[in-house]
């Protein structure tokens, strides 16, 4: 995403403290159960997919085919990973 933002002439967030400030996914601490870890990953992916879909709508309205295509590809990959993690959990 950062490269795409640069291509469009803007400056992406580029340090960890910026990411922490704008993130909607909070850090999980001291998770020792494997299944719980996978549940946390799944919940995080659902947040990411929702945000990517919002961006997909925005890029479509803006006529930005490059970013739209990139978001579509990212969503496809995340959905596949969600399916695999759900399969792992027996869902």
Language model features: what each stretch is:
Residues 1, 5-12, 89:
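Leucine-rich amphipathic alpha-helices with coiled-coil/heptad-repeat character
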Residues 3-4, 17-73:
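Acidic/histidine-rich alpha-helical segments that form the ligand environment
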Residues 69-91:
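Short, contiguous alpha-helical
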Residues 9, 53, 82-86:
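Short amphipathic alpha-helical interaction/hinge segments
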């Amino acid at each position: 995403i950062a490269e795409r933002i640069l291509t469009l002439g803007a400056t992406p967030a580029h340090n960890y403290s910026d990411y922490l400030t704008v993130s909607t996914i909070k850090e999980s601490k001291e998770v020792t159960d494997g299944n719980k870890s996978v549940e946390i990953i799944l919940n995080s992916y659902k947040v990411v997919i929702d945000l990517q879909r919002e961006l997909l709508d925005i890029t479509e309205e803006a006529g930005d085919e490059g970013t739209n295509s990139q978001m579509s590809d990212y969503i496809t990959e995340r959905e596949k990973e969600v399916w695999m993690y759900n399969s792992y959990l027996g869902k």
